[in-house]
């Protein structure tokens, strides 16, 4: 039995090395297949113990060796397969702590960066320009607003286009569909009519009825949109209205 335990420990060591190699070679695939690996791991353990008892018979005097072998199997599972992203132990489920923390950290950093961009744009505006502009048509207003918002779009790596709301509603969002290749669902149209921002895929649509009724579209396909982007763009639109006579 002692020699068999040694063989078992040797096999455990080989499997452990294989798991480490698999993890470092393709971490994403490993995380995706982790639960299957666990099921296979314990399945092989149960089969090996069952086959051993069938061949050698049950000898309870060797319970210490069996317990040690079982502990090693569980140790490999907890120490490597589950750790550091423990998702389930004895029926108690936990979130993927490591990834969650990293995701929150990235969001906070991105939000802080967006805030700094917004502040810089506001600080660079010359107050002497306030109350000096006049827009005779909606088209003139949308072009002026678009030019003002372009500075924010360039900083975050996103395309921003301002559309006349009435024209888009009357043409089933033809302008937005042609430029951004998206279809605005009916429920989103209802939200826009209620002056609520929506997001279709990774394209944000912000309704603004400050000077004129417009839809501000942010294309975040190259750089994922943040919630802060919607707030910043709307606030910049308000700031732009100060230019009006």
From Swiss-Prot:
Any one biological process term the GO annotation gives: sporulation resulting in formation of a cellular spore
GO cellular component, one term: plasma membrane
Location(s) in or outside the cell: Cell membrane
Residue intervals passing through the bilayer: 2-22, 43-63, 66-86
Keywords: Cell membrane, Membrane, Sporulation, Toxin-antitoxin system, Transmembrane, Transmembrane helix
Main location: membrane
Membrane topology, record value: Multi-pass membrane protein
Signal peptide: none
Role description: Toxic component of a type II toxin-antitoxin (TA) system. Upon expression in E.coli growth ceases. Upon coexpression with SpoIISB in E.coli normal growth is restored.
Family of the protein in this entry: Belongs to the SpoIISA toxin family.
Subunit structure: Probably forms a complex with SpoIISB in which SpoIISB neutralizes the toxic activity.
Record's protein name: Stage II sporulation protein SA
Originating species: Bacillus cereus (strain ATCC 14579 / DSM 31 / CCUG 7414 / JCM 2152 / NBRC 15305 / NCIMB 9373 / NCTC 2599 / NRRL B-3711)
Organism classification: Bacteria, Bacillati, Bacillota, Bacilli, Bacillales
Name of the encoding gene: spoIISA
């Amino acid at each position: 039995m002692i020699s068999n335990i040694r063989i078992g420990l040797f096999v455990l060591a080989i499997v452990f090395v294989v798991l480490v190699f698999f993890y470092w070679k393709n971490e994403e695939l490993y995380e995706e297949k982790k639960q299957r690996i666990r099921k296979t791991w314990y399945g092989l353990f149960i089969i090996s113990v069952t086959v051993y008892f069938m061949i050698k018979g049950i000898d309870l005097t060797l319970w210490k060796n069996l317990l040690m072998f079982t502990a090693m199997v569980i140790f490999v599972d907890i120490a490597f397969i589950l750790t550091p992203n423990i998702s389930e132990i004895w029926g108690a489920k936990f979130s993927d702590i490591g990834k969650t923390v990293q995701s929150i950290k990235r969001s906070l950093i991105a939000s802080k960066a967006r805030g700094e961009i917004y502040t810089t744009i506001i600080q660079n505006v010359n107050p002497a320009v306030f109350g000096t502009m006049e827009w005779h048509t909606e088209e003139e207003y949308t072009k002026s607003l678009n030019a003002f918002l372009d500075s924010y779009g360039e900083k975050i790596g996103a395309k921003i286009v301002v559309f006349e709301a009435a024209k888009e509603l009357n043409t089933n969002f033809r302008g937005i569909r042609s430029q951004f290749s998206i279809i605005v669902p009916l429920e989103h149209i209802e939200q826009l009519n209620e002056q609520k921002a929506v997001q279709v895929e990774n394209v944000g649509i912000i309704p603004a009825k400050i000077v004129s009724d417009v839809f501000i579209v942010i294309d975040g396909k190259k750089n994922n949109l943040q919630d802060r982007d919607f707030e910043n763009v709307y606030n910049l639109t308000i700031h732009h209205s100060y230019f009006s006579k």
